[in-house]
Amino acid sequence: MKSNIHPKYEEITVTCSCGNVFKTRSTANRDLHIDLCSECHPFYTGKQRAVSAAGQVEKFRKRYGGGQ
C-alpha cells in the first residue's frame, strides 16, 4: 500500500448563523460557517410551516379554472 496518500483529518470548528458552535473532524483545513444546523433547522426544532391543503386546491382551481 502507498503511504502518505490520505488527506489529513483534523478537528475544525463549525459556527452556525444562529450562534451555535460545535467541533467536528474533517479534511477541510479551515473552520466552517453554516446557515442552518440541528439547533435552528425547522425539521429538528418542530417549527415547520404547515401548508394548508385546502388553500393549495383553491389556488390550483383558480389558476386552471377547474371548479365544481
Curated annotation (Swiss-Prot):
Function: Binds the 23S rRNA.
GO molecular function terms listed in the Swiss-Prot or TrEMBL record: metal ion binding; rRNA binding; structural constituent of ribosome
Organism name: Acidithiobacillus ferrooxidans (strain ATCC 23270 / DSM 14882 / CIP 104768 / NCIMB 8455)
Biological process, per Gene Ontology: translation
Binding site for Zn(2+): C16, C18, C37, C40
Family: Belongs to the bacterial ribosomal protein bL31 family. Type A subfamily.
Domain of life: Bacteria
The protein, known as: Large ribosomal subunit protein bL31
Primary gene name: rpmE
